[in-house]
Amino acid sequence: MMMGEVQSLPSAGLHPALQDALTLALAARPQEKAPGRYELQGDNIFMNVMTFNTQSPVEKKAELHEQYIDIQLLLNGEERILFGMAGTARQCEEFHHEDDYQLCSTIDNEQAIILKPGMFAVFMPGEPHKPGCVVGEPGEIKKVVVKVKADLMA
């Protein structure tokens, strides 16, 4: 897991493929987009714009991916994301290969970050993460998740 702020993107230390993907997403002006999927570079890089209310972590499950890296960028509101190191997800459901995700009930040695608008978090394949968790009181957030095919890092 890595995190940073859009305003200091050039010094964030991201792999060039991730920096390019985030730059493409920002150029597409996600804050002005309706919720939905937007292709940036075919299936290699796309973004999902979403608006929803944050929830208690006990109401949510962690997610894992195999083929894609997640760059979670908060546009409005405040969001807590719980996460763990690769291999720490427990009580996992069947993997959905077509949509590249698996849901898990728990994360061993769970950690947390709080995102504010303009902040992003990067989750590599295999790193469990539970986005959309409440900070204080539930509230509406708008975010974009940039999906980057992991083999672009090769």
UniProtKB/Swiss-Prot annotation:
Its main location: cytoplasm. Keywords: Cytoplasm, Zinc. Disruption phenotype: No visible effect on growth on Neu5Ac at pH 7.0 and 37 degrees Celsius. Shows slight systematic growth delay at pH 6.0 and 20 degrees Celsius. No visible phenotype on glucose. Signal peptide: none annotated. One of its GO terms (cellular component) is cytosol. One of its GO terms (biological process) is DNA damage response. SUPFAM superfamilies: Clavaminate synthase-like (SSF51197). Coiled coil: none annotated. A His-tag on the N-terminus blocks activity, while a C-terminal His-tag does not. This is N-acetylneuraminate anomerase NanQ. It comes from Escherichia coli (strain K12).
